[in-house]
Amino acid sequence: MARGYDETEVKFRLIKLLHSSKSGISGVEISEKLGINRVTMSKYLNKFAAEGTITQKNIGNLNLWFVDEDIEQLNFPDDYFLVQEKFLSHVVDCNERPVYNLIKNCINSKAKMDKIITEIIIPTIPQIKKLFDDGKIGKSEEQLMTGIMLNSIQMITHHSGHSESGKNVIILSADSESLLLSESAAAAFRSQNWNVFSIGDISSSIDVLFDLELRKLLSKTWKSKDGVMIVLVFSQTEEGLKFISDSFYSVK
């Protein structure tokens, strides 16, 4: 990108400008109003469009730029608490699009991927569980909200970098209630360039052959025995945690 401009500041000013117009603004007009030459502004517009921050529409002979009303530029770390409140509200209302746009806003505003997990998504998990335990939402609503949060976690995973050799972690959930936490942990580790093997909920796979399954798993995921391999288990019960940990100790 061209020198002399702060990308975050350009994006903030651009979003504010586009929000002021319902009919779209041409690239030439954007360049004039932001005081940035056309060539440089064109590069910014194409970059922000590729990120999904803005969109372009051809209307007649004009190419006009728009921004969705849910798109905004955030300031981190100051906005983590505000975003978590919005995230919870949208999830409880089962409004998928605002949830995904909120995560997109976080990513485009340069929030740290692991912080999106720890400051926004993970605090929401017990709040949803409490609503269910208190009888304020039903099972189907809880499942829908869980799916929305899993999709949000997947969005973060898609923006993770390449894994580093020698940093390996197996993450699993001993029950369905721990799935969101295990998937959150997987996304957080991926954001730190770990080579993650996320197994998910294995409660239906626990039987007398479980030790054998673990041997096969380790032989495939850690063939070279290079670096470190961490096994991270999430469980709502001490029994589930102990059973799986004992199984791994038996095959280490």
What are these regions (language model features)?
Residues L34, L64, S204-I206:
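Short secondary-structure capping/turn micro-motifs that flank functional sites
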Residues L18-S23:
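Short helix-capping/hinge SLiMs at alpha-helix to coil transitions
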Residues V10, G24-S26:
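Residues that mark the N-terminal boundary/hinge immediately upstream of a DNA-recognition element
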Residues I36-S160:
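Long amphipathic alpha-helical segments
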Residues E29-S31:
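A short acidic, leucine-rich amphipathic alpha-helix
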Residues G135-G138, N151-K252:
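C-terminal regulatory/effector modules of DNA-binding transcriptional regulators
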Residues M1-I15, P77-D78:
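Short alpha-helical segments that sit at the start of domains
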